[in-house]
Amino acid sequence: MDGCDCIEPLWPTDELLIKYQYISDFFIALAYFSIPLELIYFVKKSSFFPYRWVLIQFGAFIVLCGATHLINLWTFTTHTKTVAMVMTVAKVSTAVVSCATALMLVHIIPDLLSVKTRELFLKNKAEQLDREMGLIRTQEETGRHVRMLTHEIRSTLDRHTILKTTLVELGGTLGLEECALWMPSRSGSSLQLSHTLRHQITVGSTVSINLPVVNQVFSSNRAIIIPHTSPLARIRPLAGRYVPPEVAAVRVPLLHLSNFQINDWPELSAKSYAIMVLMLPSDSARKWHVHELELVEVVADQVAVALSHAAILEESMRARDLLMEQNVALDLARREAEMAIRARNDFLAVMNHEMRTPMNAIIALSSLLLETELTPEQRLMVETVLKSSNLLATLINDVLDLSKLEDGSLELEIKAFNLHAVFKEVMSFIKPIAAIKRLSVSVMLAPDLPLCAIGDEKRLMQTILNISGNAVKFTKEGHITLVASVVKADSLREFRTPDFHPTASDDNFYLKVQIKDTGCGISPQDLPQVFTKFAQSQPGGNRGYSGSGLGLAICKRFVTLMGGHIWLDSEGTGRGCTVTFVIQLGICDNTNAYQQKLIPLVWPSSGDADFVGPVPNAPNEEKGQASLKSRYQRSI
């Protein structure tokens, strides 16, 4: 029976197997018991865990598994029925809990997987937020640099300083190797290198404005990358450079510079641009980032605004200098004009005395000669001399009065005077002249015309005499009518013009004087010039009449000084004319003093001029003066 021995000699003995199983079950039970303790510890440390009841169930499963292994230690030797029962209960409990845990994990595992998915999503979201925060920080940094550059650029209004500051600040902020500005030439056909940062090459080089790269930069409102071999990128020497740098270019609008003509600015007929070129260091692998290009674009816009402000300032300074020069020239011209006016006034003052004295003597002697026995030929010659002398005296007075009116030195002599006496004096001068031409003269004074008034008696009489004299002068036959009246308050609006605004008052009234004749009349086209000095109408019926053309011009100045308005109406040549003027006079309270008083006036000479003539003896002086005055009045 030796061949039936089946025990292999290399297999360990039963005691050794039992020993290994015993030790393994012990460590398995120890591990099973430690796992729930670890779960309980970490769950307690966690402030939030949604699956506590799952952990409790899982922990019970592990504890029961460990208990089965622990009870199994007593089953390797002879054991009682109680141990077998405990082992059976433990395994049944473990089986029940294990199945329940397995069924529960079917529902729990998808939730755990979704938690992991959400974790990955949150992680990706956090990374995206980190990138956005980095972009925001970059934008804030860019904005800070833009504000700094803008402040530096706008700290001055000198365009050369603006461009130099821009290049320096951009070079420092972006770490540029070179930065340059190409400005359009005066002809507008090329771009000229005007400013560089490092001054590595001499400014003044030009490139054609028709190059494709130039058109590409002009057509884009963004900063773009251009080839390093482009003519615009030739802003630093090429020797010793092996790594080509990245070059960016952006257009700089020249805003509104076409409105200014400033020294070396180009003459622009349309919107034009300069080009700013920026070069990164060639010894690095740097590339242009989007935020850097955006910074360059913003700075280019700020430079454009600053250059336009500088252009406006330069133009305003040039205009100010030109205005100062013009003011100096005007002041010099004003002084020269004042000197000329003073010289003219001095000349007129001398001529007033030097010409009137012999003229008065000629008039006086001519008047005396007419009182003597003369032949018809002699009388005709003397009358011609007297008429010419009177005309010359009138011209002298007109020129003197006009010069005073033009330089503003003539002032009205406001005083109370006899208004009716003025018209009587005028008639005493006009009627003898009209009688020679067989003209009838009539005067009509309104019943409500005040006896006295307050104003310039001399200028009023001179105005009426000038107009009446013209009426007699230009009338061959017919009559002359002078009408004087007071303008009613409710009729003042009829006389209003853009330059004349009469207003009623208790202290003054408006005198209306109208002088109508049946003379040669005035053509409609000549009416606008009748009050212009040295202007004379020349209709057919006016030929042969002499005059200076100053009479009506002086009358208009006098009427304006007296706060009035004058105008002339005529229906045409040969239909006569009517001159009307309205002046403002003051109301005089004391009328008794003017009942019988006539103010002696001499016309056309001024009130302070005396007629000087030969006086044979003192007793005959008064008689000679009366004879001179009578003859002088008749000869006007």
Curated annotation (Swiss-Prot):
Disruption phenotype: Dwarf, chlorina and half sterility phenotypes.
InterPro entries linked to this entry: GAF (IPR003018), GAF-like_dom_sf (IPR029016), HATPase_C_sf (IPR036890), His_kinase_dom (IPR005467), HisK_dim/P_dom (IPR003661), HisK_dim/P_sf (IPR036097), Sig_transdc_His_kin-like_C (IPR004358)
Cofactors (names): Cu cation
Chain residues that bind Cu cation: 65, 69
Subcellular location: Endoplasmic reticulum membrane
Histidine kinase domain sequence ranges: 350-587
EC number: 2.7.13.3
Protein keywords: ATP-binding, Copper, Disulfide bond, Endoplasmic reticulum, Ethylene signaling pathway, Kinase, Membrane, Metal-binding, Nucleotide-binding, Phosphoprotein, Receptor, Transferase, Transmembrane, Transmembrane helix, Two-component regulatory system
Residues bearing PTM Phosphohistidine: 353
GO function term, MF aspect, one: phosphorelay sensor kinase activity
Database matches in Pfam families: ETR1_N, GAF, HATPase_c, HisKA
Assembly behavior: Homodimer.
Record function comment: Ethylene receptor related to bacterial two-component regulators. Acts as a redundant negative regulator of ethylene signaling.
Protein name: Probable ethylene response sensor 1
Species lineage: Eukaryota, Viridiplantae, Streptophyta, Embryophyta, Tracheophyta
